[in-house]
Amino acid sequence: MAKIHELSEILANQIAAGEVVERPASVVKELVENSIDAGAKQIDIIIEDAGLKSIQIIDDGNGIEAEDVETAFKRHATSKIIDRKDLFKVHTLGFRGEALPSIASVSDVVMETAVSGRAGTKIHIKGGEVLEKTLSASREGTTITVSDLFYNTPARLKYLKSVQTELSYISDIVNRLALSHTDVALSLTNNGRQLLQSAGNGNLQQTIGAIYGVQNARQMIKFEDANLDFKISGYTSLPKLTRASRNYISLLVNGRYVKNFQLTKAVIEGYGSKLMTGRYPITVLSIELDPTLVDVNVHPTKQEIKISKEDELVTFIQKTIFERIGQENLIPDGLQNIKSKTKEKLDFEQLKVGLNEASKQYQTKQHRTGITSEVTAALFGEKLTKDESQTQTNEKIKEETKVELSPIIIKDKQDLKSDRVKEWDEKYQSRNKETEVTSIAEKNGSVDDKRKDTPRFPTLRYIGQMHGTFLFAEGEEGLYIVDQHAAQERVKYEYYREEIGKVSPTQQNLLVPIVLTYPTTDALIIDENIDKLKELGIYLEDFGQNTYIIRQHPTWFKEGQEESIIREMIDYFLKDRKLSIAKFREKTAIMMSCKRSIKANHHLDDKQAKSILEQLKTCENPFNCPHGRPVLVKLSNKDLEHMFKRIQDPHHTGILEED
């Protein structure tokens, strides 16, 4: 009797479902992608109990012809490719023909679909078997309902996470789909509670606001660039807005959300030393390239891809983000943390209006799962944008709020036109208009004329030092507080980065050579990278089994720390044996700058302090130390005037009553 036999189609589909359908989020992803491929512009995702009970996808796409409905649930049946050539130039999200049969084999599926001008079709499939197929009075588009997921695969059902965890996975993938297809209006509802509603108007910035919150969207800047092979665009957050996970970086390749470690790493490295260790930006990166340069047929989920010329793309992304971030003045607002604790709910409502009305419409306070967050003013205080919609909001506040401003007494509206009120407004409001935050479109778009005229780093005049740790300086826009250690660390980092790259032949001979001994495993790695050490001026001579002797060192070493510096440099290769020369130089420069910089409680004279400020101004990046900490913060003139009540809130022009 033959031992090898062909598996039944239902069993084969259930096996395939192990890769295609991992959890309810996989079902949502596959079905929504089918809707997008069908030309849908409105897709409603309605789930119960995070998809464990039911998942319903309703779209207004092209629908499926009656004669194709049953065929669509057969393995490798698709309308998206025909021959081998199509496989290497895929323009659709799906093409393998595995999703529908895999889903139907492990659940109870009911689908109603219709094409324009024709009667609809309803089909009911459970466990891969067709139970019913009838005509139906359906509108154009498709409605598919999946219930009892994994009812016949108890092992898979057993290892699903909690309802909240599964809901977060669904929310995450829907967010990514909304970001990659901004022209499609997506809504997600769980147990009657709406979690997301995107506008579907093609505005990426607005979609980001709907997902991450309007305040976060305000702190993201637009970037775009193109060369012969690639076109990249998107939004990325300023260094002050970060997260503890790389999960907030969304990579979109030809409209497909993908995961790629090298591209994610390129985004992070584009920030250089502007990010704190362990912190990551919020980024939406869209990459457009010829489909022949990318292979999406790597895994059934199609989230893992292979890209030709990946190294060139990595360099291109890193360079584009680095240059875009470099255009920004990254001095943080010194009162940001204080403001964040005292902001009232009213300020948050005003801020939401600032992005645009459509963003306000689709902002949802219930969206708390997955990568989304309900942003409140208590977390991200931000200056308000002076746009038309905000002005209308402020006018409403003026009418409702009454504030006593002695000694000016206003009895009626005519008194608002008095000379004293005009004099007050001219004195305390006219100059503030010059420092208003620009609109979000200007802020996140190309640099406007006003910003081009503003120097990237201010001219500072030294005032004094506090506790041997902070330097105080004044500039045209206000008071600046400088962390003296972080400032000198930045200056020395850029100095050592350049010096280490020179590899001067001049060496300092050691009176007593340094002898280093390592275990065999470490010695093998050191031998593998010994040429890289030579490029930085570290010459290790063989001095017996697993032992090395150093007789000289570069002149930029700090006296008395020669052995510790060399050991630390060698440790870099022991931790990462594939460390590149460029990364090695950067790590060494960071180490040297930290070791040779002044510390806290170190009192400086005026000449030394002024020298640090002058050197800081010449730095390529004067805003952060090599570890990402801020070098200085600013208290603007307006902030100081607010603190001393020299200017009042915008609603001070309300009608007042005389006692």
Swiss-Prot record:
GO cellular component term of the entry, any: mismatch repair complex
UniProtKB keywords: DNA damage, DNA repair
Gene Ontology biological-process annotations: mismatch repair
Pfam family, one: DNA_mis_repair
One Gene Ontology term of the molecular function aspect: ATP binding
Record function comment: This protein is involved in the repair of mismatches in DNA. It is required for dam-dependent methyl-directed DNA mismatch repair. May act as a 'molecular matchmaker', a protein that promotes the formation of a stable complex between two or more DNA-binding proteins in an ATP-dependent manner without itself being part of a final effector complex.
Family: Belongs to the DNA mismatch repair MutL/HexB family.
Protein's recorded name: DNA mismatch repair protein MutL
Species this chain originates from: Ligilactobacillus salivarius (strain UCC118) (Lactobacillus salivarius)
Gene behind the chain: mutL
